[in-house]
Amino acid sequence: MIGRLKGILIEKQPPYLLLDVNGVGYELQAPMTTFYRLPSLGHEVVLHTHLSITENLHQLFGFAEQRDRSLFRTLIKVNGVGPKLAVAILSGMESDDIARCVRDNNIKALTRVPGIGQKTAERLVIELRDRLKNWDLPQGDMLAHGEIQAIASDNDIYAEAESALIALGYKPVDAAKMVASAAKQKPEARSEELIRIALRSLAGV
């Protein structure tokens, strides 16, 4: 079982990243909340990992924080929630925000994540309520994301942001609208920050 990787970040195109660990390249999938915390290319990073093994597929997922990995592992135990949807959920809001939605029975916020309908959101709240009852929540409202790192050139900022949103499950036309709206709010934003703004606007936080 691979539980932690320390290496040089050599590629990142949400939701995928590539880590060079002693000459071996590890491809991982990660939620946007992890991408927000990544250093620029060529720098060292430590990621907490989860290896998902099925009959035909081995997937490695990376997380900047142990609590994000912990919540990911809790999410995939919910009936109907696989790794892809768990990544989408963790991309839409911080772990503490998800726990807060469960605590407050905030179905509406959860349904804004692509792939989560009313029934799935209700199931998440029901099944996670006991599992997250000891989650240490900070005081206050929905959390703000951390500092954002720039990853794209000026020519492909919008394209990268749209591609990332599409990979998270949004339709191309919706992704384009979300990026355009985010760009109006902050014209100088880089791709990762555009994604952050778009996702937070959709979640209403």
Curated annotation (Swiss-Prot):
Keywords: Cytoplasm, DNA damage, DNA recombination, DNA repair, DNA-binding. CDD domains: UBA_RuvA_C. Disulfide bonds: none annotated. It is found in: Cytoplasm. Residues 1-64 are annotated as: Domain I. GO terms for molecular function: ATP binding; four-way junction DNA binding; four-way junction helicase activity. It comes from the Bacteria. Residues 153-205 are annotated as: Domain III. The keyword Ribosomal protein does not apply. Residues 65-143 are annotated as: Domain II. The keyword NAD does not apply. GO terms for biological process: DNA recombination; DNA repair. Belongs to the RuvA family. HAMAP family: DNA_HJ_migration_RuvA. The RuvA-RuvB-RuvC complex processes Holliday junction (HJ) DNA during genetic recombination and DNA repair, while the RuvA-RuvB complex plays an important role in the rescue of blocked DNA replication forks via replication fork reversal (RFR). RuvA specifically binds to HJ cruciform DNA, conferring on it an open structure. The RuvB hexamer acts as an ATP-dependent pump, pulling dsDNA into and through the RuvAB complex. HJ branch migration allows RuvC to scan DNA until it finds its consensus sequence, where it cleaves and resolves the cruciform DNA. Homotetramer. Forms an RuvA(8)-RuvB(12)-Holliday junction (HJ) complex. HJ DNA is sandwiched between 2 RuvA tetramers; dsDNA enters through RuvA and exits via RuvB. An RuvB hexamer assembles on each DNA strand where it exits the tetramer. Each RuvB hexamer is contacted by two RuvA subunits (via domain III) on 2 adjacent RuvB subunits; this complex drives branch migration. In the full resolvosome a probable DNA-RuvA(4)-RuvB(12)-RuvC(2) complex forms which resolves the HJ. Has three domains with a flexible linker between the domains II and III and assumes an 'L' shape. Domain III is highly mobile and contacts RuvB. This is Holliday junction branch migration complex subunit RuvA. It comes from Cellvibrio japonicus (strain Ueda107) (Pseudomonas fluorescens subsp. cellulosa).
